[in-house]
């Protein structure tokens, strides 16, 4: 009898053990398949695939950037400026002094010879040329002037996607003159373009600073702008260096990750005599909102009667 009970117990234990083994095997298989999923480190970085993020001021906060990734973004800005790397595609709008269909053809033909131009639209009635491409603004303006026609930048970016898609800071002398343009490409990326004259030859540090207070020039603009959720060994507003040639002129074109144009309005851009920004600063200008595409078809300034072609 005892032998019979032992045999019965052993026989019933076999299916149970098999069931436990099956469950364990299923669990291990599931764990194994989860482990085979790509880790975050193997996914494309923001520098190679610009993922859309919620607009500034929305309920969701943008994910914090790992220190190394943010540092790389800052390094990429300087590298792009030094090597003349192509900028991201952006819609840019110009007002061009066109009077006939021949003008339209001349403008289109000129742009079609350039690399980095994806599409061009010409509105003869409004004298407007819209260019989708990755060339700096100055290059496109020079191209328009080469057709023998006056041209003015009137808009950048896409105001349908952003509350503020473009901004500008103007340096009006008496020694240093220049303009800095900022345009939002997407919520993770902005373009910074600058042209300066009147600088001493050599390298100059420059940055986006916290305040737009110019009562004491660059000295009263505060620290380098750095939002609280930005993690890097360098502040987000650090724009690296400008290198002025023998004539005191400098140009800069690069993209910068995590920079949101809407958050920069009312702050300032400051220039320094030294590369490390150890001096009080030599010039500064307030960052102001600039027109987006389709927002500025005005040809006459109502305040002084100056036409767009007469303005500097």
Swiss-Prot record:
Residues where Cu cation 1 binds: 100, 103
- Name any Gene Ontology BP term: removal of superoxide radicals
Q: Which cofactor does it need?
A: Cu(2+)
The note on cofactor binding and number reads: Binds 2 copper ions per subunit.
Disulphide bonds in the chain? none
Q: Where in the cell is it found?
A: Plastid, Chloroplast
Q: Name one Pfam family in it.
A: HMA
- Where on the tree of life does the source sit, at the highest rank? Eukaryota
Q: Which GO terms describe its cellular component?
A: chloroplast; cytoplasm
What GO molecular function annotations does the UniProt record carry, in alphabetical order?
A: copper ion binding; superoxide dismutase copper chaperone activity
What function is annotated for this protein?
Answer: Copper chaperone for superoxide dismutases (SODs). Binds copper ions and delivers them specifically to SODs. Is required for assistance in SODs disulfide bond formation and thereby activation of SODs.
Give the protein's recorded name.
Answer: Copper chaperone for superoxide dismutase, chloroplastic
Per the record, the gene is: CCS
């Amino acid at each position: 009898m005892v032998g019979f009970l032992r045999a019965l117990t052993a026989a019933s234990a076999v299916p149970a053990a098999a069931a436990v083994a099956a469950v364990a095997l299923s669990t291990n298989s599931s764990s194994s398949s989860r482990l085979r999923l790509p880790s975050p480190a193997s996914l494309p970085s923001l520098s190679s695939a610009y993922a859309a993020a919620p607009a500034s001021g929305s309920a969701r906060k943008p994910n914090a950037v790992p220190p190394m990734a943010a540092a790389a973004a800052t390094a990429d800005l300087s590298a792009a400026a030094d090597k003349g790397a192509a900028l991201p595609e952006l819609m840019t709008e110009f007002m061009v002094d066109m009077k006939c269909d021949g003008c339209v053809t001349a403008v289109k033909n000129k742009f079609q010879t350039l690399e980095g131009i994806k599409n061009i639209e010409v509105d003869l009635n409004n004298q407007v040329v819209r260019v989708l491409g990755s060339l700096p603004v100055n290059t496109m303006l020079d191209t328009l002037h080469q057709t023998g026609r006056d041209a003015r930048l009137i808009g950048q970016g896409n105001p349908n996607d952003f509350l503020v898609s473009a901004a500008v800071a103007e340096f009006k002398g008496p020694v240093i003159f220049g303009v800095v343009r900022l345009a939002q490409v997407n919520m993770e990326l902005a373009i910074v373009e600058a042209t300066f004259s009147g600088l001493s030859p050599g390298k100059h540090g420059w940055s986006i600073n916290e305040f737009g207070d110019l009562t004491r020039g660059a000295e009263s603009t505060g620290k380098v702008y750095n939002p609280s959720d930005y993690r890097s060994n360098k502040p987000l507003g650090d724009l690296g260096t400008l290198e002025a040639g023998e004539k005191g002129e400098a140009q800069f074109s690069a993209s910068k990750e995590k920079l949101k144009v809407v958050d920069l309005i009312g702050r300032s851009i400051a220039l320094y005599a030294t590369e490390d920004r150890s001096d009080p600063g030599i010039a500064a200008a307030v960052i102001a909102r600039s027109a987006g595409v389709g927002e500025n078809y005005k040809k006459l300034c109502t305040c002084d009667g100056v036409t767009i072609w007469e303005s500097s």
